[in-house]
Structures are given as structure tokens and as C-alpha cells.
């Protein structure tokens, strides 16, 4: 049995539809309170997006589907074996209130709210800008509105949530998409089974 870690939420739906469309599974993976789902030869572990790579690195899962944003924030000792460029598409951006756009172009020091601490620090260090990072685990759009931060670093898919909260994109950091990652030991001992999946998904 091949153990596959997949994230809860939006990516679960996309991955389920992808596997179904490629005849890898006979029915969709339904999101429910059940966190381990066995379908044919696969055991799906439904976990938090930020935990997928940990499950794979530690060998609890053989392979996993994870966003590039997660891998950049917290690199792991795993193999990245396939890009799913049309799955989990989003962008990592710096966003803030429109009136801050002029200030953004002449930054020397700023407060940034984000859950992507390492990405934010690396990005602004590359610009030689000193920042005070305020780590938040959700609803980061609130931070600039109430004056907790000057800007946020977060992922956006359509920009709708930013717009609804009166924020605009100041700068794109990178585009993100899903990747299939693999445990290093599993890659050796389950190589045949893993490559059967890759063959079916390689045109994505």
C-alpha cells in the first residue's frame, strides 16, 4: 500500500479530482472527520498543509502533495519529484493599503505580518530592508487595517480577499503551485509504484 499525504482544504479537492481523472482512484476523496482514507492500493493521510512535508520526511507517508510556498518556508530532506503546475496555483505577494504604495518604493524599515516568516525575511533582506516580523497564523489581512503592520506577506489565488479588505498587491515574490514530494527511502523501495503514478500525472 502506498501512503500519500495530502493537505486539507482546497488542494484536497483538486488532488482528488486529478487522481480521479487519471483513473488512479475509482471515487473522490471526500473531506470529512476521517483523516485516513483507504482507496484501492492507496492510503491517503489528510493533514494540515504545513505538515505534509514532515509526514513525508519522517516516513509516515511515502509521497505527498504540497505547495511550493510550504517547501520554501520550511525546506525538508525529501525529493521533489514532479511539478503539478496547474494544481494549487497561487502567488506569494507583499500586500498593503493603497496609500502605502509610495512608501513601499522607498522602504528602509517596516513592520510585516505573515505566517511565512522565513520567506518574508529572505525577501526583504534581499532588498536590504530591515523588517520587524509579526507572526500570525491566519487572517493576516486584518493587520494593516488596524495598524498592527505596514504590510503583509501571504499567498493569494484571485486577489478577492485582499480587495475585500481594502488591500492591494505591492509586489509579487513568486508564483506557487503544487509539487509531488517523496521520502528518500520510499523512493528506493517503492520506486515502481511511485513511477506508475508519475507516468499518469507527468502531463499535468
UniProtKB/Swiss-Prot annotation:
A GO molecular-function descriptor: ATP phosphoribosyltransferase activity
GO cellular component terms, A-Z: cytoplasm
Q: What is its EC number?
A: 2.4.2.17
Alphabetic keyword roster = Amino-acid biosynthesis, ATP-binding, Cytoplasm, Glycosyltransferase, Histidine biosynthesis, Nucleotide-binding, Transferase
Q: Please name one Pfam family that this protein belongs to.
A: HisG
Coiled-coil regions in this chain?
Answer: none
The record's annotation in InterPro entries points to: ATP_PRibTrfase_cat, ATP_PRibTrfase_CS, ATP_PRibTrfase_HisG, ATP_PRibTrfase_HisG_short
* Pathway per the UniProt entry: Amino-acid biosynthesis; L-histidine biosynthesis; L-histidine from 5-phospho-alpha-D-ribose 1-diphosphate: step 1/9
Q: Tell me how this protein assembles.
A: Heteromultimer composed of HisG and HisZ subunits.
Xref: HAMAP family: HisG_Short
Question: Which NCBIfam families does the record match to this protein?
Answer: hisG
Q: What is this protein called?
A: ATP phosphoribosyltransferase
Organism, scientific name:
Hydrogenobaculum sp. (strain Y04AAS1)
Amino acid at each position: 500500500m502506498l501512503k500519500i499525504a495530502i493537505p486539507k482544504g482546497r488542494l484536497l479537492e483538486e488532488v482528488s479530482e486529478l487522481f480521479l481523472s487519471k483513473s488512479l482512484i475509482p471515487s473522490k476523496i471526500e473531506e470529512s472527520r476521517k483523516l485516513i482514507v483507504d482507496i484501492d492500493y492507496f492510503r491517503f493521510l489528510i493533514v494540515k498543509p504545513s505538515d505534509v512535508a514532515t509526514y513525508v520526511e519522517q516516513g509516515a507517508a511515502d509521497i505527498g502533495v504540497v505547495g511550493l510556498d510550504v517547501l520554501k518556508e520550511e525546506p525538508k530532506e525529501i525529493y521533489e519529484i514532479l511539478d503539478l503546475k496547474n494544481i494549487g496555483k497561487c502567488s506569494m505577494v507583499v500586500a498593503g493599503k493603497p496609500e502605502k504604495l509610495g512608501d513601499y518604493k522607498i522602504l528602509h524599515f517596516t513592520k510585516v505580518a505573515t505566517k511565512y516568516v522565513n520567506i518574508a525575511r529572505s525577501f526583504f533582506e534581499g532588498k536590504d530592508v530591515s523588517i520587524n516580523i509579526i507572526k500570525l497564523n491566519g487572517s493576516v489581512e486584518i493587520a494593516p487595517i488596524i495598524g498592527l503592520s505596514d504590510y503583509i506577506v501571504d499567498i493569494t489565488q484571485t486577489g478577492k480577499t485582499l480587495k475585500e479588505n481594502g488591500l492591494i498587491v505591492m509586489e509579487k515574490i513568486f508564483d506557487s503551485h503544487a509539487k509531488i514530494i517523496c521520502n528518500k527511502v520510499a523512493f528506493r523501495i517503492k520506486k515502481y509504484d511511485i513511477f506508475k503514478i508519475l507516468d499518469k500525472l507527468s502531463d499535468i
